[in-house]
A protein has these predicted regions:
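Short, acidic/polar
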Residues: 41-52, 111-125
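Structural motif corresponding to the early beta-alpha repeats
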Residues: 84-111
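Active-site mouth loops of central-metabolism enzymes
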Residues: 33-42, 104-114
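Generic leucine side-chain signal with a strong bias for well-ordered alpha-helical environments
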Residues: 23, 48, 124-127, 139
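N-terminal binding-site loop/beta-alpha segment at the start of enzyme catalytic domains
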Residues: 1-93
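Conserved small/polar residues in nucleotide/adenosyl-binding loops
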Residues: 135-141
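Active-site-proximal loop/turn and secondary-structure-junction residues that shape catalytic pockets
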Residues: 34, 64-66, 98-102, 137
């Protein structure tokens, strides 16, 4: 059976503007870390996302290293975007971030421009998207 979102979803959540961007975000966002790794079923992930969206949560937050394994959360959420959220992409705010070790070699870590651009390209590929609403860099404390 196809997912039909709650028609009252936007009356149940308060939304606020994000700085001067004009972007409205719900007071609650859904982070897709451990619950969206390969250790959980896609059905469980779909149920979590449907419940969140039915309650007015429109912002889904990911990162290049969310899983396990790293990258799995983006890949799994990408599957949900093609199925349950296929007709609702314009209603979603999708963010991702980078900043942790992801691949071998001198460019798979930390915060260089090269790393951030490569990481974003890989995230978009895993998500099956041309763009995300925003991305940011999370840097571990450098001693």
């Amino acid at each position: 059976m196809a997912y039909i979102p709650n028609a009252e979803r936007y009356t149940q959540m308060e939304y606020r503007r994000c700085g001067r961007s004009g972007l409205k975000l719900p007071l609650l966002s859904m982070g897709l870390w451990h619950n969206f790794g390969d250790t959980n079923s896609l059905e469980h992930m779909a149920q979590l996302c449907e419940t969140a969206f039915d309650g007015g949560i429109t912002h889904f937050d990911l990162a290049n290293n969310y899983g396990p394994p790293a990258g799995a959360a983006e890949r799994n959420f990408g599957k949900l975007l093609k199925t349950i959220f296929a007709g609702h992409r314009d209603e979603l705010v999708i963010s991702t971030k980078a900043g942790y070790d992801m691949w071998e070699g001198p460019y798979g870590e930390w915060g260089s421009r090269k790393y951030l651009l490569a990481s974003l390209d890989q995230s978009l590929q895993r998500l099956g998207l041309d763009s995300v609403s925003y991305t940011h860099l999370t840097l571990p404390t450098i001693a």
